[in-house]
Amino acid sequence: MNTNDEKMKIISEDFTGDGVDTEAGRRKKNSKVRRQQRKKKPPASPPEEMVSDKFQDGGQQEVVEEEPETNLLSLTARRGPRSLPPIPSASRTGFAEFSMRERMREKLQAARSKAESALLRDVPTPRPRRLRSPSREKETETEFGTEPSTEVQDTQKEDDTKSYSRIKFRDSVRKIKSKPQLPPGFPSAEEAYNFFTFNFDPEPEESEEKSPVKGGERAHHEDQEGEEGTQAQERAKKTEEEELLNGKDAEDFLLGLDPTAHDFVAVRAAEYKSARIQLQKEKEILFTPSRLTVPTYKKLPENIQPRFLEDEGLYIGARPEVARTNENIMENRLLIQEPGSKWFGDDGRILALPSPIKPFPSRPSLTTREQSPKAGLETLYKKAEKYVHSRQHMIGSGDPPGNFQLDIDISGLIFTHHPCFSREHVLASKLAQLYDQYLARQQRNKTKFLTDKLQALRKAVQTSLNPEKPHQSLDTTQKTINEYKSEIRQTRKLRDAEQEKDRTLLKTIIKVWKEMKSLREFQRFTNTPLKLVLRKEKVDPKLDEDAYEAEIQAEIHELLEEHMEEYATKMEEYRTSHQQWKAWRKAQRAKKKKKKQTTEEHLEEEEAEESFPEEEVTKPIPPEPTDPAVIEQQVRERAAHSRRRPGEPTLIPELSLAGNVTPNDQCPRVEVSRREDVRRRSVYLKVVFNSKEVSRTVSRPLGADFRVHFGQIFNLQIFNWPESLMLQVYETIGHSGTTLLAEVFLPIPETTLVTGRAPIEEVEFSSNQHVTLDHEGVGSGVPFSFEADGSNQLTLMTSGKVSHSVAWAVGENGIPLIPPLSQQNIGFRSALRRADAISSIGTSGLTDMKKLAKWAAESKLDPNDPNHAPLMQLISVATSGESYVPDFFRLEQLQQEFNFVSEEELNRSKRFRLLHLRSQEVPEFRNYKQIPAYDREIMEKVFQDYEKRLRDRNVIETKDHLDMHRATVAKYLQQVREAVVNRFLTAKHHFLLTDLVVEEEVPNISSEGSGILGLSLFKLAEQKRPLRPRRKGRKKVTAQNLSDGDIKLLVNIIRAYDIPVRKPVVSKFQQPSRSSRTFSEKQTASPSTHSPLHNADYPLGQVLVRPFVEVSFQRTICHTTTAEGPNPSWNEELELPFRAPNGDYSTASLQSVKDDVYINIFDEVLYDILEDDRERGSGIHTRIERHWLGCVKIPFSTIYFQARIDGTFKIDIPPVLLGYSKERNIIMERAFDSARSLSEGSYITLFITIEPQLVPGEPMREKMSDMLKKFDTQEDEKLLQATEKFQAECALKFPQRQCLTTVTDMTGKTVFITRYLKPLNPPQELLHVYPNNPQATAELVARYVSLIPFLPDSVSFAGVCDLWSTSDQFLDLLAGDEEEHAVLLCNYFLFLGKKAWLVMGSAIPEGPTAYVLTWEKNYYLIWNPCSGHCYGQFDAFCPLKSVGCLIGPDNIWFNIQHHDSPLRINFDVTKPKLWKSFFSRSLPYPGLSSVQPEELIYQHTDKAVAAELQDRIEKILKEKIMDWRPRHLTRWNRYCTSTLRHFLPLLERSQGEDIEDDHRAELLKQLGDYRFSGFPLHMPYSEVKPLVEAVYSTGVHNIDLPNVEFALAVYIHPYPKNVLSVWIYVASLVRNR
């Protein structure tokens, strides 16, 4: 390129973007520059060179600091005066400077004129300004220099020319800079010429630092350049001119002027760089790794030996094939590049994944050229074969028919025991089995394997403990070490166990051999050729001793580490406990100190607050450190027991058949007879395929060694897959018949097992036949002994092994002849495989996945090993839930095929859900009937109650329970019930024949007599006696055919005794009002003797009573007629309907009915309300009122279980009955008094039954009870067997008497009943009431027990069982039946020092129940724990009617006397003729521990809570009474209520005795103007509903007088453990006129 072209490119680059305005500005600047430079001295150097160099330098500065499309003048003005450092000033004006300026001016003018003409020619229109993208700027401003020889031609575009010219300027400046710089001073002509080019800033660092900042400023200004106006440009130009003339970089401006083409081209020699220098520079910049092998120590941390995992037993995959040179290069590079990286493994080699290349190709091989590609598409014709069907298990229709073959190879048979075995044969067989076991263990050599594993683990621990272990965190290292140590412990235990087994086995072999030699010496002949030789291998004592001691020390060290870790853990726990104890003790001291400082006023409050005893914290005991001597002694003892002693030679037994058998002529006669018997016996086998005999072996004689060789192969031609394969072993004796010894089942072979590959296997068999022989043969199934005295007897059964192999045959073409398993969905076998893929392959393929996964986890299989891949995949699939092997057999394999709808759709069906819930006997749907046939007919609200109960399962509702404790107890009882119901679900579904089949009994002519005809025939001719009718048996009905209205409750009221009689009413004025006098009072005062209400013989003019009975059940009321006198007789039958809850008449529902039958006795009083006595002769105006006297409450569950209740019951009469007294008639009741002993009260005789008679549900099936005794109990098996035997003997003698030995606790487990009896402390405050009166204390304790609410198990656990809870559970639940009350009361009496027993018998009305019997000084007392009453033994009104057994803390006595009534039996249990004891001399008492707690802890009940509960109950009862009187106004007499409220605490303290007169006087004093009728009710508190029912049954609200007033008071007395005594006083008041 010539200079003119270069000039044109440079000029176009600098000026094209700015146009004419820029040209004018440049001219002004040139004139200013010339004036500036005249002051300087002209240089002596040639002007061409100087201009060229100067321009080149200026071009370089421009390119470096200037961006494209930027005007030179504007940039210079923007750059400011500090772009370049100042030039050192000197006096340089002269001719040279002047001439240089003139030449510069002329050349510039010429260049400018040429540029203008070129621009006008090439660019007719000015080029618009635009901003360039950063990418273009970056492409333009590259740092790669270009040599002048590599310039491109001028055909390139203008942008390329601009960038290229800048690159050239930059290279020129770079070359000039490389030259040495001259020192400053007065220049010569050459120096003056070169001044502008080479005199640079002496501080170049400052320029370099400032340049990027200016560049940033320029970029910021350039962004706003296109938006500036014309005026702003002119102002900028003026400012730039001034700065150029006066600034410091005027020289720099001249450097940027455009020179001519020949001024900046320098001609010099070409630069050359040698190859050596080039390589040297490349070595400084580039790194070339070495190809030499890197030493191993450089690739591992210091002091670390390489570890080869493959030698330690871990699987290492095959590494990919890489050239060793490449591997060395990579290792050297990694060591230099990343010296601390994780690229190297423990073996010093680069980490590499196993080679992913398969050893065989995945794609099928291409067909050869000779074979035509259409050959595989040709049709192959095969003739159709007729298929033979056989039973089931047929091949699917898609399977090809054909003949298949199964080969059975029967090698031989050997007996491990036979009836003809002599004693020596028994020992020889045992010795042979032991030796086989020894050989098997030696082949496995598990001891050595575990020893090597233990050494490897110890070595791994030592390697992991190295502190310089790389690329592992401390947590990971510690975790690995802990895993190693845990595995070391486990491996050491296994190694010790294996060593002990080996040593024990060797000792046993030697022992049996010695016994065999002793037997041979004793019998003086030999029957077997066995001979045992013990070969000794000597060992090096020194090495053996060292190894032994090293192992001992290593084990001691490991055990010490374990104990130290355990000690450290215990020590940490001790420190924590000790700190807690110190804090507790400090708090206790602070409390004591605070207690001393409090005043006496606050003592009571603090005692009330601290009434709950705090749990005392015991001082912890520090753990004892481990004694190393003890550890060492234990290790050495264990080693001496299980290992070979050091220096002791190794014994290797060798069993051979080198012995000699004694000939027959040297043996005794019995042995010769045995050998003759063996010769007469022969054995053969039958082959049974699919339960059919297909072949049999030849009969072979039994050898003297009891071995039989067959050597036969049976080829079975089959069509279907085999169901079973069996061998039958037969034995023939002489010419007699054959005997089947055993059946041996053979597994169906796998489909991969073919003939030629099947190994010979041994399968064992045994026989249960009993054989006794008359010679030396020991027989089978009969005992024999090796001892002379017949001790240590053995009983062996016939057994042996059959050697066989079963495999599939191979056809002529090499294809196995196996019945195919069709892959289609048709065919039984295919469906079987699809339903259960694993179990369908046959019994040999069954695998327990749980055990397999457990074994894999414990064995720690290497998951990287390809050999384990199928196993690991199978385990992962099985454990993930996708597939599993069930631990049960499938009853319906094809259920999935017959499912007509999916599970999801079935679960969405409302009808199916309803049916499912009903079948599960959910309470809301238990007896749901008439379920609609379509889902659309079932409403969503049907499930609302059930879903609400599920949501509120854990929510405790206090609506039905006024206090929180009882609400919690009710919730807990519900949870216990659900748990127990689930546990006894099996018993409920264990049906008997009578449950399913209801039919009348076939008349039996001898059913009621002991003879052949019996008494049935005599009854036909028996005379009828109408005055003495006999009860006939009723038919029992079940719940299936019952509905509402079918069941009636029949109550027969017969008579009553000692009803309270009225007392004369006396007011303040000693005269009642006219209207308040009863008929009886007036009749008594009148002279007439004809009134039926008054008898002349009635002594002392007593007031009569007119009682009648009202029966209330489920709010249905019936009553009898009114009788007269204190001993009335009704003999009336009342009928009440029964309605089951929710219409459910099932057994479980009937058992859970909580309703009670209330039998109330009322006195009917007639009041004369006639106002005028003068009208008495013409009319009668009376009003009938009834006064409640007492009641008898009988639960319906008792009636249901007893079927009928017949007896005399004590009437519960309130302790205060105003207007009535118990003054008995002296004349009429004298005979009655003679029969009374300790009991006082009124009685009523009843007969209650249900019509029709219902079948009561059995609480638990006998079989289920037996099963629970066997599986759910912690009692000793011998004790349970003794209980079963004891109960069987007792039931055989007296089947109707109750005999109880074991019971079921709250968890469903069987417990021996005496464990429930133990002295337990009653509440302390009860013992302080009567400290000197034991009898009063006993009555008070009995009353406390009776205050705990009664809840029978038949209601709480309906249809399940009778559960017994311990006393602490009973007090926590505050609910229980007779057994819990009796156990608690008996335990209290035992604590008080009384002789007490639990009485299991039958009472009225409870039925089978539990009472308590105590022995006082000279008589027995029978206590009813539910009522708190006690009765004498000879009390005729005692509710206990029969006694079955007595239970004490240490024994059980069953009543074997002829009578069972308490009146007629003797309670002296020391007489064995009267009482059969469970524990006796033959079975002594084993000292059973009690299930009861050591002591009972009582919490005091909060009195404030009791008072709040009292107010709430009173409010509820008042609201109920007002609801019961909807047609009348109910007025409350507050004054009377206050009086009654003050009276109720007196009743609680005196228990209702000896305060009636004081109470009557108080009421007469305060309420004399009122006729008062009322009574207090006393009940234990459980919930509100029983209180409401009790008040309702009294009928106090049934008074219709307009001026009647009511009074109601409630008092609750709290006892410990939240036991509450409730008193309710209800009264009605009528003002006297």
UniProtKB/Swiss-Prot annotation:
Start-end of Basic residues biased regions: 26-42
Keyword set includes Coiled coil: yes
Amino acid composition bias (Acidic residues), ranges on this chain: 602-615
Positions with biased composition (Polar residues): 1068-1092
Disrupted-gene phenotype: Embryos show randomized left-right axes, holoprosencephaly, microphthalmia and a variably expressive curved body axis. Cc2d2a null embryos also have cilia defects, which are exemplified by the absence of Arl13b staining in neural tube and surrounding mesenchyme.
Domain (C2) ranges: 1031-1209
Keyword annotations: Cell projection, Cilium, Cilium biogenesis/degradation, Coiled coil, Cytoplasm, Cytoskeleton
Any Gene Ontology biological process: neural tube closure
Function field: Component of the tectonic-like complex, a complex localized at the transition zone of primary cilia and acting as a barrier that prevents diffusion of transmembrane proteins between the cilia and plasma membranes. Required for ciliogenesis and sonic hedgehog/SHH signaling.
Subunit field text: Part of the tectonic-like complex (also named B9 complex).
Name of the protein in its database record: Coiled-coil and C2 domain-containing protein 2A
Naturally occurring in which organism (per UniProt): Mus musculus
Gene that specifies this protein: Cc2d2a
